[in-house]
């Protein structure tokens, strides 16, 4: 889904891309934007994910809206919302430059309402796209992972056994965890 969303956003060389959310989708979006030749800013509250974002290609990694505005006062050419939180979806168009683009990749609970100010988007001619799964990008995504174009290794923060999975699912993730994977018979 990240690749499809980034295709929709169409980041270009020299553009500025703000990625909101430091989970797996956001960190993959950072790599894809960097591959396009964009300047990339990652917005996530987690200091561990900020560091990881910088290590995988983000030019900047910050924790607040005001930090973003300090770096890019006019806003970003492309804002990619990956957190799936009502507040960040509402914020996304406000951090785009006039004439900019927004892609919502984060999944919000079905039925949840998100306040957006249409006049601001109209006045500043912000394009907003929503992206979900697209089976036509799976082969290309797998190839990018297989050939190392996209590095997923740093996104796996913990490997757990099948026996540990129940406790891991029931417990809050450790600070900075991006993704735990289950490997049967893993000691």
Question: What does each model-found stretch correspond to?
Answer:
Residues 90-94, 135-187:
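C-terminal hydrophobic helical "lid"/dimerization subdomain
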Residues 105-109, 131-133, 156:
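Short strand-turn motif at the edge of the Rossmann-like AdoMet-binding core
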């Amino acid at each position: 889904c990240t690749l499809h969303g980034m295709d929709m956003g169409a980041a270009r060389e020299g553009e500025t891309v703000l990625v909101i959310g430091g989970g797996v989708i956001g960190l993959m979006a950072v790599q894809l934007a960097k591959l396009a030749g964009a300047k990339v800013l990652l917005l996530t509250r987690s200091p561990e994910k900020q560091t990881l974002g910088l290590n995988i290609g983000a030019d900047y990694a910050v924790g607040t809206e005001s930090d973003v505005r300090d770096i890019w006062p006019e806003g970003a050419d492309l804002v990619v919302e990956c957190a799936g939180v009502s507040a960040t979806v509402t914020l996304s168009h406000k951090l785009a430059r006039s004439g900019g683009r927004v892609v919502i990749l984060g999944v919000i609970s079905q039925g949840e309402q998100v306040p957006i100010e249409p006049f601001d988007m109209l006045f500043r001619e912000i394009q907003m796209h929503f992206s979900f799964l697209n089976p036509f990008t799976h082969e290309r995504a797998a190839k990018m992972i297989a050939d190392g174009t996209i590095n997923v290794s740093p996104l796996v923060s913990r490997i757990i056994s099948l026996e540990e999975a129940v406790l891991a699912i029931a417990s809050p993730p450790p600070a900075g965890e991006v993704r735990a994977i289950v490997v049967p018979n893993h000691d």
